[in-house]
């Protein structure tokens, strides 16, 4: 098949796809599919010759919001491809927050040691971790959590049991989880139903010792409500790889909070994305040409 890579030329990824017998072309009108690796505003108008879109990102909610996702072409994302990297980063965020790394960093002084000793918490100490959005990343995270002997709760749309989770609940039957878990990990796709799912109401149901970790999408959290909850002690802390707004402005109060750990959307990196998406694209091409559902095909109605 002929493909166009847009808007950025990733030579290593291109080499993998071409190594599978496919040809990169410059003009989208000559292509059978597009490998898209940009931001939503950069997405081009699709001519009728484009049969499918391979996106390099795990979720295409930004493209859905922009209104460019439709049934004129088939769509595939990179869901689950970054399970190892994002799950490992999530473990790092959880531990950094519970071990109060931000408190020490902001204090810039050894004198903070008594405060850390008195308030530091331990993941292995009878904790319950709720994973909201237990897809490929969530399943890998469950595996990585096993050595900590935590109780795990998976929350998904269907309520179908998630491998490795102690309990699984459908989203509409998980109201009790807000009061039960010690750590909440958000890996949900961004939809109308999940937009600002963490807000003043749900934060108010959490334990004062609860920690919120977001490696999914920034708008899963109402940021103003989170700031209020962190300031008034409604919850203990947050660890954020994604934020709303993003990038988070340098002057934003979250940067100065000693109960918040922030990483700049680096739970997965471009280097890893480029290394992995070529092989995924080859697999999806093979399935597409066989008339089968692609490995990471998106339901364009649901948006994920």
Curated annotation (Swiss-Prot):
Active-site residues annotated for this sequence: 217, 246, 265 (proton donor)
EC category name: oxidoreductase
Keyword NAD assigned: yes
GO molecular function: NAD binding; oxidoreductase activity, acting on the CH-OH group of donors, NAD or NADP as acceptor
Sequence positions that bind NAD(+): 136-137, 215-217, 241, 265-268
Keyword Oxidoreductase: yes
Enzyme Commission no: 1.-.-.-
Keywords, comma-separated and alphabetical: NAD, Oxidoreductase
Family affiliation: Belongs to the D-isomer specific 2-hydroxyacid dehydrogenase family.
The protein's name: Uncharacterized protein Cgl2355/cg2587
Species name: Corynebacterium glutamicum (strain ATCC 13032 / DSM 20300 / JCM 1318 / BCRC 11384 / CCUG 27702 / LMG 3730 / NBRC 12168 / NCIMB 10025 / NRRL B-2784 / 534)
Lineage per the UniProt record: Bacteria, Bacillati, Actinomycetota, Actinomycetes, Mycobacteriales
């Amino acid at each position: 098949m002929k493909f166009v890579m847009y808007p950025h030329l990733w030579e290593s990824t291109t080499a993998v796809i071409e190594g599978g017998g496919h040809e990169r072309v410059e003009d989208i009108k000559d292509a059978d599919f597009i490998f898209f690796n940009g931001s939503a505003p950069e997405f081009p108008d699709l001519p009728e010759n484009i049969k499918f879109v391979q996106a390099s990102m795990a979720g295409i909610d930004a493209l859905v919001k922009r209104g460019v996702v439709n049934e004129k072409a088939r769509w595939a994302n990179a869901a689950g491809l970054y399970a190892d990297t994002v799950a490992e980063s999530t473990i790092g965020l959880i531990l950094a927050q519970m071990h109060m790394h931000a408190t020490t960093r902001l204090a810039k002084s050894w004198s903070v040691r008594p405060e850390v000793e008195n308030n530091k918490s331990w993941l292995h100490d009878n904790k319950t971790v709720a994973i909201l959005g237990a897809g490929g990343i969530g399943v890998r995270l469950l595996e990585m959590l096993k050595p900590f002997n935590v109780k795990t709760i998976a929350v998904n749309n269907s309520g179908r049991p998630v491998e490795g989770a102690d309990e699984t609940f459908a989203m509409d039957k998980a109201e009790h989880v807000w009061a039960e878990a010690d750590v909440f990990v958000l890996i949900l796709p961004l939809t109308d139903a999940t937009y600002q799912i963490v807000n003043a109401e749900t934060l108010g149901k959490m334990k004062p010792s609860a920690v919120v970790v977001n490696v999914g999408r920034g708008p899963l959290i109402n940021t103003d409500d989170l700031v209020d909850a962190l300031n008034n002690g409604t919850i203990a802390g947050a660890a954020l790889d994604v934020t709303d707004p993003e990038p988070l402005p340098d002057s934003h109060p979250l940067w100065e909070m000693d109960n918040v750990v922030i990483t700049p959307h680096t739970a997965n990196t471009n280097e890893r994305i480029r290394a992995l998406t070529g092989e995924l694209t080859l697999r999806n091409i093979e399935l597409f040409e066989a008339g089968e559902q692609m490995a990471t095909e998106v339901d364009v109605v649901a948006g994920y």
